[in-house]
């Protein structure tokens, strides 16, 4: 049987946790930023609990069981491609894909190289460049150039493993935004928002032996397919349409971070 197809799902059961709030997406300041970036009303975090020990090598069984669970089906939200309204999936998932996303970064010093390489000035202002397109994104500054243009001079300041890190993915998604994104002139709103969302989603603990802080969460980028093709996070594939599953194996919590590319709420 192909990876991620329905088989022995190992007895995972889930429960929706509507009482869990994500301040990083709902505070007044962040809401204002998401509106400017054309992501407001199109990004959502939800929390679920589960009842079995999570084992990362069984991630496909875990994710498939999630989509089949009667407590998930009426509660997992996604945006309708046709109406733009929040809906539930409403179709039977036949196959899933869960890609491991490394999550090891404990500090925003990861982004100091943006200053070191003159992509951001000491003042925090992002260095401008001549306009170009990397479809569908307008590139008008050095930040978007280093994020998107593989043959650009400074692309390699972030290695491929760096770019796969959840912290980098989150930062890049916020920088690129939605369909009518108004870009920031300074770097701080992107860094601050990335940090707040990351801290809200990712779990850490102090190692009892070494006394060092370590990340306990596992992160996966998830897609689901019905008999017609991809149905989640959307039937339409886009770099800015995503769903990340952040699994805390100790608390047995699953955080789902979802965004669907489009025109965000203006009001």
From Swiss-Prot:
- Which factors induce or repress this protein, as stated in its UniProt record? Up-regulated during ciliogenesis.
One GO term describing the cellular component: cytoskeleton
Q: Report quaternary structure and partners.
A: Interacts with DNAAF2.
Domain of life, per lineage:
Eukaryota
The protein in question is named Cilia- and flagella-associated protein 300
InterPro entries reported in the protein's UniProt record? CFAP300
Give the residue spans that cross the bilayer: none
Tissue distribution is: Expressed in nasal epithelial cells.
- Name of the gene this protein is made from: CFAP300
């Amino acid at each position: 049987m192909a990876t991620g197809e329905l088989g022995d799902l190992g007895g995972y059961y889930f429960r929706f946790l509507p009482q869990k709030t994500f301040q990083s997406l709902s505070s007044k300041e962040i809401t204002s930023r998401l509106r400017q970036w054309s992501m407001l009303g199109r990004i959502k975090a939800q929390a679920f609990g589960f009842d079995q020990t999570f084992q990362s090598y069984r991630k496909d069984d875990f994710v498939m069981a999630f989509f089949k669970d009667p407590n998930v089906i009426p509660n997992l939200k996604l945006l309708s491609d046709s109406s733009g309204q929040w809906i539930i999936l409403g179709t039977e998932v036949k196959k899933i894909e869960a890609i491991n996303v490394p999550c090891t970064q404990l500090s925003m010093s990861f982004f100091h190289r943006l200053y070191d390489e003159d992509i951001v000035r000491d003042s925090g202002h992002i260095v401008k460049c001549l306009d170009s397109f990397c479809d569908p994104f307008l590139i008008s500054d050095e930040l978007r150039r280093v994020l998107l243009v593989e043959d650009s001079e400074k692309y390699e300041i972030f290695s491929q493993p760096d770019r796969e890190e959840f912290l980098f993915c989150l930062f890049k998604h916020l920088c690129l935004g939605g369909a009518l994104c108004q870009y920031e002139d300074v770097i701080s709103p992107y860094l601050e928002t990335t940090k707040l969302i990351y801290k809200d989603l990712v779990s850490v603990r102090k190692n009892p032996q070494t006394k060092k802080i370590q990340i306990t969460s596992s992160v996966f980028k998830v897609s689901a397919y019905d008999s017609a093709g991809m149905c989640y996070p959307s039937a339409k594939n886009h770099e800015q349409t995503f769903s990340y599953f952040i699994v805390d194996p100790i608390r047995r919590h699953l955080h789902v971070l979802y965004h669907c590319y489009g025109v965000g709420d203006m009001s």
